[in-house]
A protein has these predicted regions:
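C-terminal outer-membrane beta-barrel translocator/porin domains of Gram-negative envelope proteins
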Residues: 209-213, 217-338, 402-405
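A short alpha/beta connector and helix-capping loop motif
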Residues: 363-376, 388
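Gram-negative outer-membrane beta-barrel proteins
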Residues: 38, 80-82, 107, 123, ...
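Periplasmic polypeptide-binding modules associated with outer-membrane biogenesis and secretion
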Residues: 2-89, 100, 114-131, 247-252, ...
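Gram-negative/organellar outer-membrane beta-barrel architecture
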Residues: 74-221, 227-229, 297-319, 386-405
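Extended hydrophobic-aromatic, low-complexity segments
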Residues: 26, 335-347, 359-362, 385-388
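Short basic (Lys/Arg) and small-residue
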Residues: 353
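Small/polar, glycine/serine/threonine/aspartate-rich low-complexity segments that form flexible
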Residues: 80-93, 287-288, 358-369
Length: 405
């Protein structure tokens, strides 16, 4: 009995890419994992969309299956983005102004080149180049040169800090990322006031860093689901004999869940935990290694300044060890939309966060627990991370506004 083979209209026969006027085609094809000659898999199709969008160089990514063709349609974002630096520091309580340029698709290879700085207020400049996939399987290269000239807001001195980093990394599978960095850091005081007795006028370190990241988020900038786990270690070898070497260990975990609630658009619940531990003891650390538990980086709803904290908490704010966690509910207010190569959208956020700080690992205590809560907004623009403004409150009647990106 003869066997008749009928054509399979669900097979992917070819992949066509359209819209990449500047981006090299191999940059796009290496992100597409749907096999040719296999039936269409809608799950892989959605994952391919997310991988291309996560490159950060397209304002629109769409994949359609028509006539056995895997049709990839792209809208490239502007490659060169001017950066008007208008920044307010909660710590220095100063505005800074400057200008920069970001090339987010250098040579069409998804390389990010940035050059810019602030020239009024807190003065700094930075130049960086990042190639997330320079050769092989996700072998990356990143370099940063940074200089900052500023006043320390907590102690009476002015300093100049210089940082230079060379970093490379690779992937193991799609979710496991490893990075290795070698950097140089110098911190020199130009004026000296009332500082701790052991504080030196100059510090120089050679830093060895290692980062591991496990990432299953669907969209990096605004996840609907997935997890992000990371570990960072750093060993700083002092290049000056009378200064101590410094070791640092940190970890973080974030989880995202898309909820079903008819009164909100794409509501996402997330929670996270972060731990930071430094050695040697607090009294042997230089001032630039001190951490401050309140403010935009950790517990929102509090100041970064110890003297602005509620009575009884001052000594537990300027610390070297931190355990921090948060709960957030985020929902779309203005759906992200392509406005001619620039994507823009707004989300609303409700949050509760808490943290404990200590000067030694053995001194962690729930008696020092800080709790903050509030609401805010995230503004999504193609290219940079989202800009957020958060209005934080605490149980002691204080309120603070936190602006960050």
């Amino acid at each position: 009995m003869p066997l008749f083979l009928l054509p399979n209209n669900d097979l992917v026969d070819k992949i066509i890419i359209d819209g990449n006027k500047k981006t090299k085609e191999n940059v796009i094809r290496r992100e597409i994992l749907h096999p040719i000659g296999q039936p269409l898999d809608s799950l892989i199709l959605n994952e391919d969309i997310n991988r291309l969008y996560n490159l950060g160089i397209f304002s629109t990514v769409d994949i359609q299956f028509k006539n056995n063709t895997y049709q990839v349609d792209l809208v490239e974002s502007f490659s060169i983005i001017p950066d008007l630096v208008i920044d307010y520091s909660e710590i220095t309580k100063k505005w800074s102004y400057g200008f920069g340029l970001a090339h987010i698709n250098f040579f069409g290879l998804n390389q990010q080149l940035y050059l810019g700085g602030a020239f009024i207020g807190e003065k700094w400049f930075v130049i960086s180049l990042n190639n997330p996939w320079i050769y092989g399987d996700h072998v990356s290269f990143n370099t940063v040169l940074y200089n900052r000239f500023s006043d320390n807001p907590f102690y009476d001195y002015r300093f100049n800090a210089t940082y230079f980093l060379v970093e490379t990394g690779f992937y193991n599978g799609l979710n496991n990322k490893f990075e290795f960095g070698l950097s140089y850091y110098k911190n020199k005081k130009h004026t000296r006031g009332d500082v701790p007795q052991n504080e030196q006028d100059i510090y120089r370190y050679l830093n060895l860093e290692f980062n591991y990241q496990y990432d299953t988020r669907d969209v990096y900038k605004d996840p609907l689901k997935g997890s992000l786990f990371g570990i960072n270690t750093r060993y700083s070898k002092s290049l000056i004999n009378n200064n101590s070497d410094i070791s640092q260990l940190s970890f973080s975990l974030q989880n995202f869940f898309l909820l079903k609630f008819k009164y909100l658009h794409e509501p996402v619940f997330s929670y996270g935990i972060y731990g930071l531990f430094k050695f040697p003891k607090f009294l042997k650390l230089p001032i630039h290694e001190y951490e401050y538990l309140g403010g935009e980086d950790f517990v929102r709803g509090y100041s970064s300044f110890p003297n602005e904290y509620p009575d009884g908490f001052e000594k537990n704010i300027e610390v070297s060890n931190i355990i921090y966690n948060y709960l957030e509910l985020q929902s779309t207010i203005l759906k992200k939309k392509d406005y001619g190569k620039i994507e823009f959208g707004i989300d609303g956020v409700l949050f509760i966060n808490s943290g404990i700080g200590s000067k030694a690992i053995k001194q962690f205590s729930f008696d020092n627990l800080l709790i903050g809560y509030g609401f805010g907004f995230k503004f999504f623009i193609t290219g940079p991370p989202p800009i957020s403004i958060m209005f934080g409150f605490n149980p002691y009647g204080q309120k603070y506004t936190h602006l960050s990106n």
